[in-house]
C-alpha cells in the first residue's frame, strides 16, 4: 500500500509542476502572438478575412485553370505516351483502352469524342458504318457509367 501512496504523491507533484510550466509557457506564447499580431494583423495577412486558425498561414484558393489540380493515378501525358507506344507496336486493343482512359481525364463528353472521331459531318447510316462508331458507343457507355453529365467541367 505504501508503494501506491508514494506513486500518488509523485503523480500529484508531476501534474502540478507540468500545469505550472504549461501556464507559463502559454503566457509566453500569448505575448509572442500578440507581438506578431501587432506587426501583421490577421486581416492584412489573409486578404481582409480575419483568421482564427493558427494551423495554416497561407490562404488556399482553387484555380479554375486546372494547372494546380492534383492528379491521382496516371497523368494524361504518361497515358498519351503509352498510347503512342501501343500504336507503334500495333496493339489496337491496348490503344483503345488507353484512349478510353485519356478522354475522361481530359473531361471530354461523348459529343466531343463524336467530333474528334470525325463522325459529326456524316449522316447516321454512314456514321454507323464507320468502324470508329463502335469506339464512340463504347466511350458513351463508360462515360455514363462514371457519372455522365455530372462529370463535365463546372
Swiss-Prot record:
Signal sequence, start to end: 1-20
Positions of region (Disordered): 42-70
GO cellular component: extracellular region; host cell
Predominant subcellular localization, coarse grouping: secreted
Pfam family, one: RXLR
Disulfide bond residue pairs: none
Keyword set, alphabetical order: Secreted, Signal, Virulence
InterPro entries, sorted: RXLR
Entry note about domains: The RxLR-dEER motif acts to carry the protein into the host cell cytoplasm through binding to cell surface phosphatidylinositol-3-phosphate.
UniProt family annotation: Belongs to the RxLR effector family.
Name assigned to this protein: Secreted RxLR effector protein PITG_15718
Native species: Phytophthora infestans (strain T30-4) (Potato late blight agent)
Amino acid at each position: 500500500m505504501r508503494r501506491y501512496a508514494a506513486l500518488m504523491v509523485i503523480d500529484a507533484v508531476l501534474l502540478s509542476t507540468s500545469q505550472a510550466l504549461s501556464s507559463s509557457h502559454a503566457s509566453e506564447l500569448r505575448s509572442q502572438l500578440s507581438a506578431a499580431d501587432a506587426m501583421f494583423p490577421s486581416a492584412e495577412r489573409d486578404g481582409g478575412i480575419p483568421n482564427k486558425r493558427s494551423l495554416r498561414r497561407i490562404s488556399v484558393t482553387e484555380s479554375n485553370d486546372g494547372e494546380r489540380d492534383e492528379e491521382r493515378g496516371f497523368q494524361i501525358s504518361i497515358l498519351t505516351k503509352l498510347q503512342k507506344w501501343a500504336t507503334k507496336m500495333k496493339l489496337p486493343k491496348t490503344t483503345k483502352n488507353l484512349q478510353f482512359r485519356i478522354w475522361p481525364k481530359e473531361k471530354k463528353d461523348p459529343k466531343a469524342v463524336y467530333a474528334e472521331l470525325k463522325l459529326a459531318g456524316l449522316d447516321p447510316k454512314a456514321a454507323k458504318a464507320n468502324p470508329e462508331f463502335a469506339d464512340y458507343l463504347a466511350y458513351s457507355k463508360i462515360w455514363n457509367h462514371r457519372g455522365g453529365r455530372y462529370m463535365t467541367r463546372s
